[in-house]
Amino acid sequence: MVLSAADKTNVKGIFSKIGGHAEEYGAETLERMFITYPQTKTYFPHFDLQHGSAQIKAHGKKVAAALVEAVNHIDDIAGALSKLSDLHAQKLRVDPVNFRFLGHCFLVVLAIHHPSALTPEVHASLDKFMCAVGATLTAKYR
């Protein structure tokens, strides 16, 4: 998915609002995904999946950090997430549909915390960005 200059500006703008909330938003995203799409729990059999668990917070922080890394390298998302793509494709073998679930839940979390910032245009740009991230993470599955 090709991101326009406006999309890149929109994505960078909303991510600037995340600031010190990366762990919180990442954990909320995972919790929401586990509740909404319970089949995603199968990839985390060793995790305490209760609200507020240290494991969810830690992994949420990793998820958010990867998204921030993708934003910081928005013109080379594939390069920025190459190692993560290898991990998910070759070792973890995560079903590609789960990246869409994660992206949707992340959009919902941002909408909850920043309702006025998530205009239809920003929403569309974030959706395109999350699709690009998902495509990058599944590119090495082939």
Curated annotation (Swiss-Prot):
**Record: residues binding O2:** 59
Question: By its UniProt entry, which SUPFAM superfamilies does this protein fall under?
Answer: Globin-like (SSF46458)
- What range(s) does the Globin domain occupy? 2-142
* MF (Gene Ontology): haptoglobin binding; heme binding; iron ion binding; organic acid binding; oxygen binding; oxygen carrier activity; peroxidase activity
Q: Name one GO biological process term.
A: hydrogen peroxide catabolic process
PROSITE patterns, per database record: GLOBIN
- Annotated positions binding heme b: 88
Keyword presence, Iron = yes
Name the domain of life this protein comes from.
Eukaryota
This protein's GO CC annotations: blood microparticle; haptoglobin-hemoglobin complex; hemoglobin complex
Q: Which InterPro entries match?
A: Globin (IPR000971), Globin-like_sf (IPR009050), Globin/Proto (IPR012292), Hemoglobin_a-typ (IPR002338), Hemoglobin_oxygen_transport (IPR050056), Hemoglobin_pi (IPR002339)
Query: Could you tell me which Pfam families the record lists for this protein?
Result: Globin
How does this chain assemble? Heterotetramer of two alpha chains and two beta chains.
More info: This alpha chain is from the adult major tetrameric component, which has been called hemoglobin A or AII.
Name this polypeptide is given: Hemoglobin subunit alpha-A
